[in-house]
Amino acid sequence: MGIALENVNFIYQEGTPLASAALSDVSLTIEDGSYTALIGHTGSGKSTILQLLNGLLVPSQGSVRVFDTLITSTSKNKDIRQIRKQVGLVFQFAENQIFEETVLKDVAFGPQNFGVSEEDAVKTAREKLALVGIDESLFDRSPFELSGGQMRRVAIAGILAMEPSILVLDEPTAGLDPLGRKELMTLFKKLHQSGMTIVLVTHLMDDVAEYANQVYVMEKGRLVKGGKPSDVFQDVVFMEEVQLGVPKITAFCKRLADRGVSFKRLPIKIEEFKESLNG
């Protein structure tokens, strides 16, 4: 098992008049090698879970297990520091994580910070920059001279240079044009196919259907539904009640079903819809 949350509660500014409960009794598992989506509105607890997975936060109650490391309210930073190498966290606007004077130095910083030699760190940085589609001609440029999309790729390369087993993505395509979004999602798909565990926060149900093999639905700090996307999206009424909706093709087929068209199961992808027509 890759990750397990057991009865996790999290309270921001605990013990103060401003205390605010972000998570209430959340239990979930993320299997090694899976592609898991977390969905829910702003304030539902998704981003808090991501920071718990990476060890940036510790639970107020309950536990988070990442491989062999158990994180509880009493865990110290020195005991969970290694998790940040195993679990790479890409924030919503990842380009804000950039700070070095050149692209290559920025990507090499993380491995060096964990004791990798400069030579090996630079070699890894070159490999990861190539992987995310940054041309070698840009390696010695200031990252702040690049476009927003390029800066985001550099930031992601910096996370990948740490060689994480799990990649945690908080709305990674926010603000990108359709082409840039598609290219990044294709990259994450390839990383998953290579064996990496992916955890994705997104508000795009079509991306959940296309890429994820597991989805958890969060609402007001609680886990309210979970399972395979093909199962979760069958409950169109529930998904509309929580104001998240379903993939476009699923919504279309639900309207057809309401008018008498028969489906064994509502398709969640275009390919499934085509197969249902041919079947």
UniProtKB/Swiss-Prot annotation:
Its EC number is 7.-.-.-. ATP binds at residues 40-47. One of its GO terms (cellular component) is ATP-binding cassette (ABC) transporter complex. It is a peripheral membrane protein. Keywords: ATP-binding, Cell membrane, Membrane, Nucleotide-binding, Translocase, Transport. It holds the Pfam family ABC_tran. CDD domains: ABC_cobalt_CbiO_domain1 (cd03225). It is found in: Cell membrane. Residues 3-245 form the ABC transporter domain. Its main location: membrane. The keyword Transport applies. Forms a stable energy-coupling factor (ECF) transporter complex composed of 2 membrane-embedded substrate-binding proteins (S component), 2 ATP-binding proteins (A component) and 2 transmembrane proteins (T component). ATP-binding (A) component of a common energy-coupling factor (ECF) ABC-transporter complex. Unlike classic ABC transporters this ECF transporter provides the energy necessary to transport a number of different substrates. This is Energy-coupling factor transporter ATP-binding protein EcfA2. It comes from Streptococcus pneumoniae serotype 2 (strain D39 / NCTC 7466).
